[in-house]
């Protein structure tokens, strides 16, 4: 649908499209209306591709989707690039960088995937298969929010290792400097080759700021 519309709705998921109890019901009617008038709804989230596939099925969405805070774009319609556009660093590389930052600041930054299932459930509210899907990361690394007094030192380290950190509602996210939600939107616009696309951006947390800054209506 993106090839046929110059208006795109690009929406965060947690706390925006769904409430903090993970309920999508309030958004379903609006999405149906947008689909009837051929306006694409592009999910743009910190969630994994595995998580978003479930949400897309529930909402009957077929448009491309942006995952892991803008580190990757997937979609069946992205045929010229075999269904994906990758902007981020591999998870294994980010893990090495997070460990290096931990040594530099003398404080252990703990990746989400290092938590036990019980600890991760307490943090996110997810369990069972939902928790498994959340752990299936390839291009970003969420980790527990560090103490605020370390934030400036961490920023200095980020410049050294050419990464960015975005603070979300529940945790922080380590990403390549080449990937965020705004850069992902621009990459998708470039791929579409449509002139003068108007972006309606929806988000609710600091990691949505690149999305909102690259939106025309927010």
Residue ranges and their predicted role:
Residues 9-11, 65-66, 201:
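Residue-level marker for buried hydrophobic side chains located in beta-strands
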Residues 69, 202-204, 217:
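Glycine-rich beta-strand-to-loop/alpha-helix junction loops that act as flexible
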Residues 101-200, 206-207, 214:
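Conserved acidic, metal-coordinating active-site core of Asp-based
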Residues 63, 216-217:
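Receiver (REC) domain switch/active-site residues of two-component response regulators
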Residues 40, 164, 217-218:
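Residue-level detector of anion-binding/catalytic polar loops
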Residues 23-113:
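Active-site phosphate-binding/coordination module
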Residues 2-21, 185, 212:
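Asp-based phosphoryl-transfer active-site loop
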Residues 3-10, 26-41, 191-197:
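A short, Lys/Arg-enriched amphipathic alpha-helix followed by its capping loop at the start of a domain
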